[in-house]
Amino acid sequence: MDKDKKGAKQDLSEILQFVAPGTPLREGIENVLRAKTGGLIVVGFNDKVKEVVDGGFHINSSFSPAHLYELAKMDGAIILSDSGQKILYANTQLMPEATIPSSETGMRHRTAERVAKQTGCLIIAISERRNVITLYQENMKYILKDIGFILTKANQAIQTLEKYKLILDHAISNLNALEFEELVTFGDVISVLHRYEMVLRIKNEINMYIKELGTEGHLIRLQVSELITDMEQEAALFVKDYVKEKIKDPFVLLKQLQDMSSFELLDDAILLKLLGYSATTNMEEYVFPRGYRLLHKIPRLPMPIVENVVEAFGHLKLIIEADVKDLDEVEGIGAVRAQKIKKGLKRLQEKHYTDRQL
């Protein structure tokens, strides 16, 4: 965990990375699990933790898996620093407020849940009999899964990602041709936006598996990287092309999209409103892209130049119609680059027309 976030709440992805296979902490936890001694680990030592800690002895030594294993043989809880790099206390008794509700039945897990809610710190409970590692923080509870199980789920998700990526590629290929023909409708835009989001959601799910797998997730990471390189960037440029009012940071809108429920994502009216249009917009009405996405596909054309071209012409249609002289007048574009843009757009148009015919 981030050393600077003393006692701060971490999101689940950060926590999973913190205890992932390959980390010293996970090695120590696995040793305790195999020894079947059980254990309770508190990560962080803020004022709220001090209120619930009683007894034990001060260690204040560097963390090592071997030290954790030996100290876990005692009944009390182990207190680590926020970064997990130091063992601060061992054999402590945790005494959270008994009035804090808990859904757990075992004493160790009930204590862990209450301490997590009272302090906001990450609490790791290692089961003595069930061979289970449970993470608690505030109201969050997460049971770490077996590595083999996670790998199976990750591989299934990769297969799903491949299928959705094919569907997205087909939709984008069709959109490319429609953009050159000036035949894009709001229905096409919403359809592609939905497909982008579905692919990104599956990617985010796989990323959670990768974080939980730690060093075991290297091959999964490579597969995802190969499948959807620069996908967020392309989705962001697509948003910049079709959002009603120009925006500086399309990733804010993409984040709003990711925060939507599956039900909201299927509602065309909600997606139209997200892009700044009326919910009653006719889906068959034509809409014209600004040209960010296609211009970005031209090799060695920097994003600031793309921005200047769009700013100068407004829409892709006018950029395509512009001659070399018109392009040459745009800031940052000389005669050579103007020729490159004209040829690049022509090649893209021919390629996308051919792809569509196939």
Curated annotation (Swiss-Prot):
Q: Can you provide one Gene Ontology molecular function annotated for this UniProt record?
A: ATP binding
A Pfam family found in this protein is DisA-linker
Q: Does the keyword DNA damage apply?
A: yes
Does the record bear rRNA-binding in its keywords? no
Recorded catalytic reaction(s): these are:
2 ATP = 3',3'-c-di-AMP + 2 diphosphate
Cofactor dependency: Mg(2+)
Q: Which SUPFAM superfamilies match?
A: RuvA domain 2-like, YojJ-like
Q: Which residues does the annotation say bind ATP?
A: G76, L94, M107, R108, H109, R110, T111
Primary enzyme class: transferase
Report the domain of life of the source organism: Bacteria
UniProt EC number: 2.7.7.85
The DAC domain sits at: 9-147
Q: Which UniProt keywords apply?
A: ATP-binding, DNA damage, DNA repair, DNA-binding, Magnesium, Nucleotide-binding, Nucleotidyltransferase, Transferase
InterPro entries, alphabetized: DisA, DisA_sf, DNA_integrity_DisA_N_sf, DNA_integrity_scan_DisA_link, DNA_integrity_scan_DisA_N, DNA_integrity_scanning_protein, RuvA_2-like
Q: Which GO terms describe its biological process?
A: DNA repair
Q: Which Gene3D superfamilies match?
A: 5' to 3' exonuclease, C-terminal subdomain (1.10.150.20), DNA integrity scanning linker region (1.20.1260.110), DNA integrity scanning protein, DisA, N-terminal domain (3.40.1700.10)
**What does this protein's UniProt record list under function?**
Participates in a DNA-damage check-point that is active prior to asymmetric division when DNA is damaged. DisA forms globular foci that rapidly scan along the chromosomes during sporulation, searching for lesions. When a lesion is present, DisA pauses at the lesion site. This triggers a cellular response that culminates in a temporary block in sporulation initiation.
In which family does this protein belong, per the annotation?
Belongs to the DisA family.
Q: Which HAMAP family match?
A: DisA
Subunit structure, interactors included: Homooctamer.
Give the protein name, as stated in the record. Answer: DNA integrity scanning protein DisA
